[in-house]
From Swiss-Prot:
Binding, [2Fe-2S] cluster: 73, 79, 82, 114
Comment on bound cofactor: Binds 1 [2Fe-2S] cluster.
UniProt-listed InterPro entries: 2Fe-2S_ferredoxin-like_sf (IPR036010), 2Fe-2S_ferredoxin-type (IPR001041), Beta-grasp_dom_sf (IPR012675), Cbr1-like_FAD-bd_dom (IPR008333), FAD-bd_FR_type (IPR017927), Flavoprot_Pyr_Nucl_cyt_Rdtase (IPR001709), FNR_nucleotide-bd (IPR039261), NqrF (IPR010205)
Membrane topology: Single-pass membrane protein
Chain ranges of the FAD-binding FR-type domain: 133-273
The EC number(s) this enzyme carries: 7.2.1.1
Source species taxonomy: Bacteria, Pseudomonadati, Pseudomonadota, Gammaproteobacteria, Pasteurellales
Gene: nqrF
Name this protein carries in UniProt: Na(+)-translocating NADH-quinone reductase subunit F
Transmembrane segments: 5-25
Organism for this UniProt entry: Haemophilus influenzae (strain 86-028NP)
Listed GO CC annotations: plasma membrane
Subcellular location: Cell inner membrane
Cofactors required: [2Fe-2S] cluster; FAD
Length: 411
Protein backbone atom coordinates (compact mmCIF):
# COMPACT_ATOMS: atom_id res chain seq x y z
CA UNK A 1 0.00 0.00 0.00
CA UNK A 2 1.42 3.34 -1.06
CA UNK A 3 2.22 6.12 1.34
CA UNK A 4 -0.43 8.35 -0.27
CA UNK A 5 -3.13 5.74 0.32
CA UNK A 6 -2.07 5.28 3.95
CA UNK A 7 -2.10 9.06 4.43
CA UNK A 8 -5.56 9.31 2.88
CA UNK A 9 -6.88 6.51 5.09
CA UNK A 10 -5.34 8.16 8.15
CA UNK A 11 -6.96 11.48 7.32
CA UNK A 12 -10.29 9.75 6.71
CA UNK A 13 -10.09 7.84 9.99
CA UNK A 14 -9.14 11.00 11.88
CA UNK A 15 -12.03 12.87 10.26
CA UNK A 16 -14.48 10.12 11.21
CA UNK A 17 -13.23 10.16 14.81
CA UNK A 18 -13.59 13.97 14.98
CA UNK A 19 -17.09 13.80 13.53
CA UNK A 20 -18.10 11.10 16.02
CA UNK A 21 -16.69 13.15 18.91
CA UNK A 22 -18.52 16.26 17.67
CA UNK A 23 -21.74 14.25 17.44
CA UNK A 24 -21.24 12.98 21.00
CA UNK A 25 -20.54 16.50 22.27
CA UNK A 26 -23.59 17.92 20.50
CA UNK A 27 -25.74 15.11 21.87
CA UNK A 28 -24.43 15.69 25.38
CA UNK A 29 -24.95 19.43 25.00
CA UNK A 30 -28.54 18.88 23.95
CA UNK A 31 -29.09 16.89 27.13
CA UNK A 32 -27.01 18.87 29.61
CA UNK A 33 -27.04 22.48 28.40
CA UNK A 34 -30.23 24.49 28.33
CA UNK A 35 -30.98 26.01 24.95
CA UNK A 36 -33.87 27.26 22.88
CA UNK A 37 -37.29 28.42 24.03
CA UNK A 38 -39.55 26.34 26.23
CA UNK A 39 -43.19 26.65 27.25
CA UNK A 40 -44.54 26.41 30.77
CA UNK A 41 -48.26 25.60 30.84
CA UNK A 42 -49.93 26.96 33.98
CA UNK A 43 -53.16 25.70 35.55
CA UNK A 44 -54.31 24.14 32.25
CA UNK A 45 -55.12 27.66 31.06
CA UNK A 46 -53.69 28.56 27.62
CA UNK A 47 -53.88 32.27 28.50
CA UNK A 48 -51.56 31.76 31.48
CA UNK A 49 -48.90 29.79 29.55
CA UNK A 50 -45.50 31.46 29.25
CA UNK A 51 -42.70 30.98 26.73
CA UNK A 52 -39.11 31.84 27.56
CA UNK A 53 -35.51 30.66 27.01
CA UNK A 54 -34.50 27.47 28.78
CA UNK A 55 -32.23 27.80 31.78
CA UNK A 56 -32.30 28.84 35.41
CA UNK A 57 -34.83 27.88 38.03
CA UNK A 58 -38.61 27.81 37.88
CA UNK A 59 -38.89 30.54 40.53
CA UNK A 60 -36.86 32.96 38.42
CA UNK A 61 -38.56 31.91 35.18
CA UNK A 62 -41.98 32.73 36.61
CA UNK A 63 -40.75 36.03 38.08
CA UNK A 64 -39.33 37.07 34.71
CA UNK A 65 -42.89 36.92 33.38
CA UNK A 66 -44.40 38.85 36.29
CA UNK A 67 -45.56 35.80 38.26
CA UNK A 68 -44.17 36.19 41.77
CA UNK A 69 -44.13 33.10 43.96
CA UNK A 70 -43.41 33.75 47.63
CA UNK A 71 -39.81 33.01 48.68
CA UNK A 72 -38.74 34.54 51.97
CA UNK A 73 -35.17 33.26 51.58
CA UNK A 74 -34.82 34.70 48.09
CA UNK A 75 -34.52 31.34 46.36
CA UNK A 76 -32.00 29.67 48.65
CA UNK A 77 -34.16 26.64 49.38
CA UNK A 78 -34.27 27.24 53.12
CA UNK A 79 -37.70 28.79 53.77
CA UNK A 80 -39.83 26.21 51.94
CA UNK A 81 -42.41 28.77 50.85
CA UNK A 82 -42.16 28.50 47.08
CA UNK A 83 -44.01 25.18 46.88
CA UNK A 84 -45.75 24.60 43.55
CA UNK A 85 -47.17 21.51 41.86
CA UNK A 86 -45.19 20.30 38.84
CA UNK A 87 -47.42 18.04 36.76
CA UNK A 88 -44.90 17.39 33.99
CA UNK A 89 -41.19 18.13 33.52
CA UNK A 90 -38.71 19.51 36.01
CA UNK A 91 -36.80 16.28 36.66
CA UNK A 92 -36.62 14.33 39.90
CA UNK A 93 -37.13 15.95 43.29
CA UNK A 94 -33.84 16.99 44.91
CA UNK A 95 -32.60 16.12 48.42
CA UNK A 96 -32.66 19.84 49.29
CA UNK A 97 -36.44 19.83 48.86
CA UNK A 98 -37.24 16.85 51.06
CA UNK A 99 -36.93 18.77 54.33
CA UNK A 100 -39.94 20.84 53.23
CA UNK A 101 -41.92 18.33 51.18
CA UNK A 102 -43.08 14.99 52.58
CA UNK A 103 -43.30 11.73 50.63
CA UNK A 104 -47.01 12.08 49.89
CA UNK A 105 -46.56 15.62 48.57
CA UNK A 106 -43.54 14.59 46.51
CA UNK A 107 -45.55 11.77 44.95
CA UNK A 108 -48.26 14.27 44.02
CA UNK A 109 -45.70 16.47 42.25
CA UNK A 110 -45.07 19.22 44.78
CA UNK A 111 -41.68 20.92 44.41
CA UNK A 112 -39.78 23.98 45.56
CA UNK A 113 -39.83 26.36 42.59
CA UNK A 114 -36.39 27.68 43.52
CA UNK A 115 -34.88 24.19 43.08
CA UNK A 116 -36.57 23.10 39.83
CA UNK A 117 -34.38 23.44 36.73
CA UNK A 118 -36.10 24.78 33.63
CA UNK A 119 -34.69 22.63 30.83
CA UNK A 120 -37.75 21.74 28.78
CA UNK A 121 -41.47 22.21 28.44
CA UNK A 122 -43.33 21.97 31.74
CA UNK A 123 -46.82 21.86 33.20
CA UNK A 124 -47.31 23.45 36.62
CA UNK A 125 -50.16 24.27 38.95
CA UNK A 126 -50.08 27.53 40.93
CA UNK A 127 -52.48 28.96 43.53
CA UNK A 128 -54.81 31.45 41.85
CA UNK A 129 -53.96 34.19 44.37
CA UNK A 130 -50.42 34.32 42.99
CA UNK A 131 -51.74 36.06 39.90
CA UNK A 132 -52.73 39.03 42.07
CA UNK A 133 -49.14 39.55 43.21
CA UNK A 134 -47.38 42.65 41.84
CA UNK A 135 -44.24 44.73 42.30
CA UNK A 136 -44.09 48.34 43.42
CA UNK A 137 -41.31 50.88 43.84
CA UNK A 138 -42.16 52.57 47.13
CA UNK A 139 -40.76 55.63 48.87
CA UNK A 140 -39.60 55.61 52.48
CA UNK A 141 -41.78 57.94 54.58
CA UNK A 142 -40.02 57.26 57.88
CA UNK A 143 -37.82 54.66 59.55
CA UNK A 144 -37.92 55.22 63.30
CA UNK A 145 -36.87 53.16 66.31
CA UNK A 146 -39.79 51.77 68.28
CA UNK A 147 -37.54 49.72 70.59
CA UNK A 148 -33.81 49.10 71.08
CA UNK A 149 -33.58 46.65 68.19
CA UNK A 150 -36.83 47.32 66.29
CA UNK A 151 -37.56 49.97 63.69
CA UNK A 152 -40.90 50.84 62.13
CA UNK A 153 -40.39 51.22 58.38
CA UNK A 154 -43.22 53.17 56.77
CA UNK A 155 -43.43 53.08 52.96
CA UNK A 156 -45.56 55.14 50.58
CA UNK A 157 -47.13 53.15 47.76
CA UNK A 158 -47.04 54.86 44.33
CA UNK A 159 -49.95 57.26 43.87
CA UNK A 160 -53.03 55.58 42.44
CA UNK A 161 -51.77 52.11 43.38
CA UNK A 162 -53.03 49.76 46.07
CA UNK A 163 -51.60 46.65 47.73
CA UNK A 164 -54.71 44.47 48.18
CA UNK A 165 -53.55 42.62 51.29
CA UNK A 166 -55.39 40.97 54.15
CA UNK A 167 -54.54 41.47 57.81
CA UNK A 168 -51.81 39.01 58.76
CA UNK A 169 -50.30 39.05 55.27
CA UNK A 170 -46.76 39.88 54.24
CA UNK A 171 -44.73 41.41 51.45
CA UNK A 172 -41.29 40.70 50.07
CA UNK A 173 -38.70 43.45 49.99
CA UNK A 174 -35.72 43.52 47.64
CA UNK A 175 -32.21 44.94 47.90
CA UNK A 176 -29.43 45.30 45.36
CA UNK A 177 -25.75 44.76 46.31
CA UNK A 178 -24.75 47.23 49.02
CA UNK A 179 -22.56 47.99 52.02
CA UNK A 180 -24.05 49.11 55.34
CA UNK A 181 -22.01 50.51 58.23
CA UNK A 182 -23.76 50.20 61.57
CA UNK A 183 -21.97 53.33 62.81
CA UNK A 184 -24.09 55.30 60.34
CA UNK A 185 -27.42 54.17 61.86
CA UNK A 186 -29.64 56.92 63.24
CA UNK A 187 -30.59 55.59 66.68
CA UNK A 188 -32.09 57.76 69.46
CA UNK A 189 -29.98 58.27 72.57
CA UNK A 190 -32.42 56.36 74.79
CA UNK A 191 -31.49 53.12 73.01
CA UNK A 192 -27.70 53.58 73.03
CA UNK A 193 -27.07 51.67 76.27
CA UNK A 194 -27.30 48.19 74.74
CA UNK A 195 -25.66 49.29 71.49
CA UNK A 196 -22.68 50.59 73.44
CA UNK A 197 -22.63 47.61 75.81
CA UNK A 198 -22.26 45.11 72.97
CA UNK A 199 -20.37 47.50 70.65
CA UNK A 200 -22.85 46.86 67.86
CA UNK A 201 -21.63 49.96 66.03
CA UNK A 202 -18.61 47.97 64.79
CA UNK A 203 -20.55 45.79 62.39
CA UNK A 204 -20.54 46.15 58.61
CA UNK A 205 -22.91 44.30 56.30
CA UNK A 206 -21.60 43.75 52.77
CA UNK A 207 -23.91 42.12 50.23
CA UNK A 208 -22.66 41.24 46.75
CA UNK A 209 -25.89 39.95 45.24
CA UNK A 210 -29.56 40.79 44.83
CA UNK A 211 -31.50 39.59 47.88
CA UNK A 212 -35.18 39.17 48.80
CA UNK A 213 -36.74 38.68 52.23
CA UNK A 214 -40.29 38.54 53.57
CA UNK A 215 -41.75 40.73 56.32
CA UNK A 216 -45.18 40.67 57.92
CA UNK A 217 -47.13 43.90 57.69
CA UNK A 218 -47.92 45.94 60.78
CA UNK A 219 -50.41 48.06 58.85
CA UNK A 220 -53.98 46.94 58.25
CA UNK A 221 -56.04 47.29 55.04
CA UNK A 222 -57.78 50.54 56.03
CA UNK A 223 -54.45 52.35 56.30
CA UNK A 224 -54.49 53.33 52.65
CA UNK A 225 -51.44 54.26 50.63
CA UNK A 226 -48.86 52.92 53.07
CA UNK A 227 -47.13 49.73 54.11
CA UNK A 228 -45.74 49.49 57.63
CA UNK A 229 -43.18 46.93 58.82
CA UNK A 230 -41.60 46.21 62.21
CA UNK A 231 -38.02 45.12 61.52
CA UNK A 232 -35.71 43.68 64.17
CA UNK A 233 -32.02 44.14 63.45
CA UNK A 234 -30.42 40.70 63.16
CA UNK A 235 -27.11 41.21 64.95
CA UNK A 236 -24.74 38.25 65.41
CA UNK A 237 -25.53 36.11 68.47
CA UNK A 238 -23.34 36.77 71.55
CA UNK A 239 -21.68 33.36 71.20
CA UNK A 240 -20.72 34.11 67.58
CA UNK A 241 -19.74 37.79 67.63
CA UNK A 242 -17.75 37.45 64.41
CA UNK A 243 -20.65 36.04 62.39
CA UNK A 244 -22.05 38.37 59.72
CA UNK A 245 -25.12 40.43 60.64
CA UNK A 246 -28.45 39.94 58.91
CA UNK A 247 -28.28 41.19 55.34
CA UNK A 248 -31.80 42.49 54.79
CA UNK A 249 -32.41 43.82 58.29
CA UNK A 250 -29.14 45.78 58.06
CA UNK A 251 -30.23 47.19 54.72
CA UNK A 252 -33.65 48.20 56.02
CA UNK A 253 -32.18 49.86 59.09
CA UNK A 254 -29.98 51.99 56.79
CA UNK A 255 -32.95 53.40 54.86
CA UNK A 256 -33.85 57.07 55.20
CA UNK A 257 -36.87 59.17 54.24
CA UNK A 258 -37.01 59.59 50.47
CA UNK A 259 -35.16 56.38 49.63
CA UNK A 260 -36.74 54.05 47.07
CA UNK A 261 -37.56 50.44 47.94
CA UNK A 262 -38.96 47.65 45.75
CA UNK A 263 -41.57 45.37 47.28
CA UNK A 264 -43.77 42.59 45.91
CA UNK A 265 -46.93 41.02 47.23
CA UNK A 266 -49.27 40.55 48.82
CA UNK A 267 -48.67 37.06 50.18
CA UNK A 268 -49.88 35.21 53.23
CA UNK A 269 -51.87 32.53 54.95
CA UNK A 270 -51.81 33.80 58.55
CA UNK A 271 -55.38 35.06 58.25
CA UNK A 272 -58.12 35.29 60.86
CA UNK A 273 -60.79 32.62 60.79
CA UNK A 274 -64.30 33.84 60.11
CA UNK A 275 -65.90 32.42 63.24
CA UNK A 276 -67.29 33.75 66.50
CA UNK A 277 -64.67 32.01 68.64
CA UNK A 278 -62.65 33.94 71.19
CA UNK A 279 -59.35 35.24 69.80
CA UNK A 280 -56.16 35.18 71.88
CA UNK A 281 -53.17 37.01 70.38
CA UNK A 282 -49.66 36.29 71.71
CA UNK A 283 -46.65 38.28 70.54
CA UNK A 284 -43.08 39.20 71.33
CA UNK A 285 -40.41 41.38 69.73
CA UNK A 286 -41.05 42.28 66.09
CA UNK A 287 -43.85 39.71 66.21
CA UNK A 288 -45.88 42.78 67.11
CA UNK A 289 -46.37 43.46 63.38
CA UNK A 290 -49.05 40.88 62.46
CA UNK A 291 -50.63 41.29 65.92
CA UNK A 292 -51.19 44.99 65.26
CA UNK A 293 -52.48 44.27 61.76
CA UNK A 294 -54.98 41.67 62.98
CA UNK A 295 -56.23 43.53 66.04
CA UNK A 296 -56.62 46.87 64.25
CA UNK A 297 -58.44 45.11 61.42
CA UNK A 298 -60.83 43.30 63.76
CA UNK A 299 -61.68 46.37 65.83
CA UNK A 300 -61.30 49.32 63.46
CA UNK A 301 -62.41 47.90 60.10
CA UNK A 302 -64.66 44.95 60.93
CA UNK A 303 -65.91 46.35 64.26
CA UNK A 304 -65.83 42.78 65.54
CA UNK A 305 -67.64 41.93 68.76
CA UNK A 306 -65.66 38.73 69.26
CA UNK A 307 -63.99 38.43 72.65
CA UNK A 308 -60.26 39.01 72.21
CA UNK A 309 -57.14 39.59 74.25
CA UNK A 310 -53.55 40.45 73.38
CA UNK A 311 -50.60 39.21 75.45
CA UNK A 312 -47.25 40.81 74.58
CA UNK A 313 -43.84 39.95 76.01
CA UNK A 314 -41.00 42.48 76.22
CA UNK A 315 -37.69 42.72 78.08
CA UNK A 316 -38.19 46.10 79.72
CA UNK A 317 -40.49 49.10 79.60
CA UNK A 318 -38.62 50.84 76.79
CA UNK A 319 -39.23 47.80 74.55
CA UNK A 320 -43.01 48.37 74.63
CA UNK A 321 -44.43 50.14 71.59
CA UNK A 322 -47.85 51.08 70.21
CA UNK A 323 -48.92 51.31 73.86
CA UNK A 324 -51.12 54.36 73.37
CA UNK A 325 -52.83 52.74 70.38
CA UNK A 326 -53.70 49.56 72.27
CA UNK A 327 -54.73 51.49 75.36
CA UNK A 328 -57.16 53.45 73.21
CA UNK A 329 -58.53 50.32 71.55
CA UNK A 330 -59.07 48.78 74.97
CA UNK A 331 -60.91 51.89 76.18
CA UNK A 332 -63.15 51.98 73.11
CA UNK A 333 -63.90 48.24 72.84
CA UNK A 334 -65.27 46.37 75.87
CA UNK A 335 -64.58 43.05 74.09
CA UNK A 336 -60.81 43.72 73.95
CA UNK A 337 -58.11 43.73 76.63
CA UNK A 338 -54.34 43.71 76.34
CA UNK A 339 -51.52 42.85 78.74
CA UNK A 340 -47.75 43.25 78.74
CA UNK A 341 -45.29 41.09 80.67
CA UNK A 342 -41.68 42.19 81.21
CA UNK A 343 -39.07 39.45 81.41
CA UNK A 344 -36.21 41.70 82.54
CA UNK A 345 -37.68 44.89 83.99
CA UNK A 346 -35.21 47.65 84.90
CA UNK A 347 -35.23 49.31 88.33
CA UNK A 348 -36.13 52.64 86.74
CA UNK A 349 -39.17 51.04 85.08
CA UNK A 350 -41.03 51.00 88.42
CA UNK A 351 -43.05 48.22 86.81
CA UNK A 352 -46.12 46.97 88.65
CA UNK A 353 -47.55 44.85 85.85
CA UNK A 354 -46.97 41.22 84.92
CA UNK A 355 -43.41 39.87 84.95
CA UNK A 356 -41.90 36.72 83.49
CA UNK A 357 -42.22 34.95 80.16
CA UNK A 358 -45.42 35.62 78.30
CA UNK A 359 -46.54 31.98 77.99
CA UNK A 360 -46.38 31.54 81.76
CA UNK A 361 -48.16 34.84 82.37
CA UNK A 362 -50.92 33.92 79.93
CA UNK A 363 -51.41 30.53 81.54
CA UNK A 364 -51.28 31.61 85.19
CA UNK A 365 -53.42 34.71 84.79
CA UNK A 366 -55.98 33.59 82.25
CA UNK A 367 -55.96 30.16 80.64
CA UNK A 368 -55.49 28.15 83.84
CA UNK A 369 -58.95 29.19 84.97
CA UNK A 370 -60.55 29.51 81.52
CA UNK A 371 -63.61 27.28 81.24
CA UNK A 372 -62.79 26.14 77.69
CA UNK A 373 -59.31 27.16 76.46
CA UNK A 374 -59.54 24.52 73.73
CA UNK A 375 -62.38 26.47 72.09
CA UNK A 376 -60.32 29.66 71.60
CA UNK A 377 -58.32 30.57 68.50
CA UNK A 378 -54.69 31.43 69.19
CA UNK A 379 -52.74 33.75 66.90
CA UNK A 380 -49.04 34.10 67.66
CA UNK A 381 -45.83 35.59 66.33
CA UNK A 382 -42.57 36.04 68.17
CA UNK A 383 -39.09 34.63 68.73
CA UNK A 384 -38.80 30.87 68.08
CA UNK A 385 -38.31 30.09 71.77
CA UNK A 386 -41.52 31.93 72.64
CA UNK A 387 -43.47 30.23 69.87
CA UNK A 388 -42.32 26.77 70.99
CA UNK A 389 -43.18 27.48 74.65
CA UNK A 390 -46.65 28.79 73.79
CA UNK A 391 -47.43 25.86 71.50
CA UNK A 392 -46.38 23.33 74.16
CA UNK A 393 -48.54 25.08 76.75
CA UNK A 394 -51.55 25.10 74.41
CA UNK A 395 -51.06 21.43 73.51
CA UNK A 396 -50.99 20.57 77.21
CA UNK A 397 -54.35 22.34 77.52
CA UNK A 398 -55.83 20.19 74.77
CA UNK A 399 -55.92 22.84 72.04
CA UNK A 400 -56.10 21.29 68.56
CA UNK A 401 -53.67 22.26 65.78
CA UNK A 402 -56.45 23.91 63.78
CA UNK A 403 -56.86 26.52 66.52
CA UNK A 404 -53.14 27.35 66.78
CA UNK A 405 -52.14 29.82 64.07
CA UNK A 406 -48.47 30.76 63.84
CA UNK A 407 -46.75 33.44 61.78
CA UNK A 408 -43.12 32.43 61.30
CA UNK A 409 -42.05 35.98 60.44
CA UNK A 410 -41.39 38.98 62.59
CA UNK A 411 -39.91 37.31 65.64
Amino acid sequence: MSDSVILALGIAAFTVIVLVLVAIILFAKSKLVDSGDITIDINDDPEKAITLPAGGKLLGALASKGIFVSSACGGGGSCGQCIVKVKNGGGEILPTELSHINKREAKEGYRLACQVNVKGNMEVELPEEIFGVKKWECTVISNDNKATFIKELKLAIPEGEEVPFRAGGYIQIEAEPHVVNYKDFDIPEEYHEDWDKYDLWRYVSKVDEHIIRAYSMASYPEEKGIIMLNVRIATPPPRQPDAPPGQMSSYIWSLKAGDKVTISGPFGEFFAKETNAEMVFIGGGAGMAPMRSHIFDQLKRLHSKRKMSFWYGARSKREIFYQEDFDQLQAENPNFVWHVALSDALPEDNWTGYTGFIHNVLYENYLKNHEAPEDCEYYMCGPPVMNAAVIKMLKDLGVEDENILLDDFGG
